[in-house]
Structures are given as structure tokens and as C-alpha cells.
């Protein structure tokens, strides 16, 4: 019998779980207090549960975590963890400390099937979706270490391995817990889902969760984006921006979108590209994040130099587009944007090989 990992259950699902056991809803608050506030994961030590309930929980439920197989520290104080889900499945997460906040970059899949040509993870292929428990466990593992060092997580970004909107239900349930005051209690603005542009999922996300949205854009036209972000061949820039407008208008509170743009030397960094990008985003409430390309083994790309990026940024500024330039962090431990490869069993390529 497979036990239910309680880290996969949001508050509503925990209510249903305890009702099925013949228990009242207040048990949900109690178990969430133990897990997310006290950080106690042994049912036998949850003293406000009856002996019979503790015995039942031990039979049918568990609170289990991936194993930490490696922890790496960068010169700039970025921390990367490598977690083992099984013998062949590994994921990575990265903590980025700054003066006023601490951001945890978490994974949603083992590998990624979207094959963005400038991304290390995309070059590895796809193996599996993470469960909600495997997503939430990343936050709890990082929290445990950081709390011991009097550091904190103020922001969570789904910008690690995988495409979050190809694992919707697990990611949305995780967001429920990240926002829930009984769990992590983060503000909706402090949790960000980054997507390469899965249009139907963005439309569903606009109704399902109020967290922030980031779009991996990387090109101002379809011809170039088709090459850099192959999913664009299915969902064009025009369709993507239309979905973005639906997202912006769906909430009762003001929403914003961050457009990510990796700067690739002689590929997408010209004055013409900057002008086209400004024109493209003028009609939308957007901020652009210019990201210096982080090199990895066997890549065909190089990063634009600082002067080119600053010129690109100035053009966007002059046309009213809010723009920032991301500072590369954690590069010496392969923790920078686009470098999260992990150890991935590439089933996608194996399946394709069998077909031909």
C-alpha cells in the first residue's frame, strides 16, 4: 500500500483527508502547525493527536523528503542543493541572498521537454513531473538550513528545472501552500511562476492562482523565438501576449508581468531587436529583465557584453519600458540562470530514438 505523503495536500485536501478518517476539520490546522511551524514530521510526536489517530496516520500516511546529495556554496554566497528523488532522478534548487530579501529558485520537473536552445536544463530532455510534496519539500529543506544560519526565504520563484505550466496541478497546489498562512504565508507578489509560454495554461493560471507571472520571451519576433524557444512554434508571440492580457485583467488586485530576455551575442541583442521589443511590449503592463547569458558545456552561444546590454536597456527605457539587468549569481557552482542541469535520465530522447 502506497502511503499518502501529506506534503502533497493543500488545506482543502487535508480537510478531505481527515474527514475520510472520521476526524473534524480542526485536525487540518493541527497537522499544518506541526509540519510548517514546528517542523515536526514524526506522527508519534504529535501529542495533541489521539493514540489511535497517530497509529492510523503511521499506517496510511507519511511526511517524506528527497535526499540531499550535495550542497554547494558560491563565492557570492549563493547556495545550491542537489536532491535525489530516486536512483535516476535528481533536481536542483538555488538560494540567492540579497540585502533586503532571500530568493529560493525551485524546480517543478526533472529535466525539461521544451528544449530552449540557450538553457542547460532544456538540453537534457525530460524525465518526470514533480509531485506537490517534492516541490514543497524543497522549501522545507532550504528553510531548515537557512533558519540555522538566521537567514530567511522571502521570495519563491519557479525558475529552476522544468516548465511549471506543464505540471499545473502539482504547482498550483504548491502555490496554495506557499500562500497559506497555516503553511508558509507568503504574499502573492513574492511567489512567481515562470513559463516559456504555454498559452492554455496561462489562461487557466489566471483563474486558479493569484501568484506573479514571468514570461521567458527572449526574442521580439516569431522567426527568432521559434529557434530559441521551440514552443513558440505552437503558441506564437501574438497568442502569448493575448493570454498575458487575460492574466493581467483576471485578478481583483493589480497584476504585473516580468518578461525575461537572455542576452545572446549577435543573436537577439541588436538595436533593432531592442526597438522591436519596446514596440511589442508598449501596450502591456510589463517589466523586462535582461539576463546575461550563462555559459554551459557544448553551448553555441556567448553572452552579450556589458556595453551592449546597457545600450539595449537604454533603448527600452527611452520608450517607456521598465527594465532591469539581472546580475549573474552563483556561476561558479553552475547555479546561475540556465545552468540547472541536474542528473537527468533523458527519456524523451530515448522514446524518440525508438520511434525512428
Curated annotation (Swiss-Prot):
<keyword id="KW-0819">tRNA processing</keyword>
<dbReference type="GO" id="GO:0051539">
    <property type="term" value="F:4 iron, 4 sulfur cluster binding"/>
</dbReference>
<comment type="similarity">
    <text>Belongs to the radical SAM superfamily. RlmN family.</text>
</comment>
<dbReference type="GO" id="GO:0002935">
    <property type="term" value="F:tRNA (adenine(37)-C2)-methyltransferase activity"/>
</dbReference>
<dbReference type="InterPro" id="IPR040072">
    <property type="entry name" value="Methyltransferase_A"/>
</dbReference>
<keyword id="KW-0479">Metal-binding</keyword>
<keyword id="KW-1015">Disulfide bond</keyword>
<dbReference type="InterPro" id="IPR013785">
    <property type="entry name" value="Aldolase_TIM"/>
</dbReference>
<feature type="binding site">
    <location>
        <begin position="216"/>
        <end position="218"/>
    </location>
    <ligand>
        <name>S-adenosyl-L-methionine</name>
    </ligand>
</feature>
<dbReference type="InterPro" id="IPR027492">
    <property type="entry name" value="RNA_MTrfase_RlmN"/>
</dbReference>
<dbReference type="GO" id="GO:0005737">
    <property type="term" value="C:cytoplasm"/>
</dbReference>
<dbReference type="GO" id="GO:0070475">
    <property type="term" value="P:rRNA base methylation"/>
</dbReference>
<keyword id="KW-0408">Iron</keyword>
<keyword id="KW-0808">Transferase</keyword>
<dbReference type="GO" id="GO:0046872">
    <property type="term" value="F:metal ion binding"/>
</dbReference>
<keyword id="KW-0411">Iron-sulfur</keyword>
<dbReference type="Pfam" id="PF04055">
    <property type="entry name" value="Radical_SAM"/>
</dbReference>
<keyword id="KW-0963">Cytoplasm</keyword>
<feature type="domain" description="Radical SAM core">
    <location>
        <begin position="98"/>
        <end position="334"/>
    </location>
</feature>
<feature type="binding site">
    <location>
        <position position="119"/>
    </location>
    <ligand>
        <name>[4Fe-4S] cluster</name>
    </ligand>
</feature>
<keyword id="KW-0004">4Fe-4S</keyword>
<feature type="active site" description="Proton acceptor">
    <location>
        <position position="92"/>
    </location>
</feature>
<feature type="binding site">
    <location>
        <position position="116"/>
    </location>
    <ligand>
        <name>[4Fe-4S] cluster</name>
    </ligand>
</feature>
<dbReference type="InterPro" id="IPR048641">
    <property type="entry name" value="RlmN_N"/>
</dbReference>
<dbReference type="GO" id="GO:0070040">
    <property type="term" value="F:rRNA (adenine(2503)-C2-)-methyltransferase activity"/>
</dbReference>
<feature type="binding site">
    <location>
        <position position="112"/>
    </location>
    <ligand>
        <name>[4Fe-4S] cluster</name>
    </ligand>
</feature>
<feature type="binding site">
    <location>
        <position position="294"/>
    </location>
    <ligand>
        <name>S-adenosyl-L-methionine</name>
    </ligand>
</feature>
<feature type="binding site">
    <location>
        <begin position="162"/>
        <end position="163"/>
    </location>
    <ligand>
        <name>S-adenosyl-L-methionine</name>
    </ligand>
</feature>
<keyword id="KW-0489">Methyltransferase</keyword>
<dbReference type="GO" id="GO:0019843">
    <property type="term" value="F:rRNA binding"/>
</dbReference>
<dbReference type="InterPro" id="IPR004383">
    <property type="entry name" value="rRNA_lsu_MTrfase_RlmN/Cfr"/>
</dbReference>
<dbReference type="GO" id="GO:0000049">
    <property type="term" value="F:tRNA binding"/>
</dbReference>
<dbReference type="Pfam" id="PF21016">
    <property type="entry name" value="RlmN_N"/>
</dbReference>
<dbReference type="InterPro" id="IPR007197">
    <property type="entry name" value="rSAM"/>
</dbReference>
<feature type="disulfide bond" description="(transient)">
    <location>
        <begin position="105"/>
        <end position="337"/>
    </location>
</feature>
<feature type="binding site">
    <location>
        <position position="194"/>
    </location>
    <ligand>
        <name>S-adenosyl-L-methionine</name>
    </ligand>
</feature>
<feature type="active site" description="S-methylcysteine intermediate">
    <location>
        <position position="337"/>
    </location>
</feature>
<dbReference type="GO" id="GO:0030488">
    <property type="term" value="P:tRNA methylation"/>
</dbReference>
<comment type="function">
    <text>Specifically methylates position 2 of adenine 2503 in 23S rRNA and position 2 of adenine 37 in tRNAs. m2A2503 modification seems to play a crucial role in the proofreading step occurring at the peptidyl transferase center and thus would serve to optimize ribosomal fidelity.</text>
</comment>
<keyword id="KW-0698">rRNA processing</keyword>
<keyword id="KW-0949">S-adenosyl-L-methionine</keyword>
<protein>
    <recommendedName>
        <fullName>Dual-specificity RNA methyltransferase RlmN</fullName>
        <ecNumber>2.1.1.192</ecNumber>
    </recommendedName>
</protein>
